[in-house]
Every structure is written in structure tokens, then in C-alpha cells.
Amino acid sequence: MARYRCCRSQSRSRCRPRRRRCRTRRRRCCRRRRRRVCCRRYTVVRCRRR
């Protein structure tokens, strides 16, 4: 499971806060199944790139 926090650019209420937060310049909110997690580089193994 992803362990990233919600992106500041996106709505925090929509994203579920995780333990760690994205440590990348480009932070985007990816939604995996029913949960939305923050993806580093907006492209993570867990999240699909758009």
C-alpha cells in the first residue's frame, strides 16, 4: 500500500493522509481503487500515470 500523504496541491479532505508525505516537486493525487493516495512524480508503481 502507498505510504504517502495527501498532496498540498490537491484537496486534503479528498486525499487520505498517510504516514509519509510526497517528497517531490510534482505532487499529484492518485486514486487507487477506492482510496486516493499521493503519488511522487505523479507516477508511482501503485498509481498509474495519466
Swiss-Prot record:
Instruction: Tell me the compartments it is located in.
Output: Nucleus; Chromosome
Ordered alphabetically, the record's keywords are: Chromosome, Developmental protein, Differentiation, DNA condensation, DNA-binding, Nucleosome core, Nucleus, Spermatogenesis
Query: What Gene Ontology terms for biological process does this UniProt record contain?
Result: chromosome condensation; sperm DNA condensation
Tissues in which the UniProt entry reports expression: Testis.
Which PROSITE patterns does the UniProt record give? PROTAMINE_P1 (PS00048)
List the Gene Ontology MF annotations in alphabetical order: DNA binding
Top-level lineage group:
Eukaryota
Mind naming one GO cellular-component term on file for this protein? nucleosome
Q: Which Pfam families match?
A: Protamine_P1
The main place the protein resides is nucleus
Its biological purpose is as follows: Protamines substitute for histones in the chromatin of sperm during the haploid phase of spermatogenesis. They compact sperm DNA into a highly condensed, stable and inactive complex.
The record's family statement is: Belongs to the protamine P1 family.
In Swiss-Prot or TrEMBL terms, this protein is called Sperm protamine P1
* Naturally occurring in which organism (per UniProt): Natalus stramineus (Mexican funnel-eared bat)
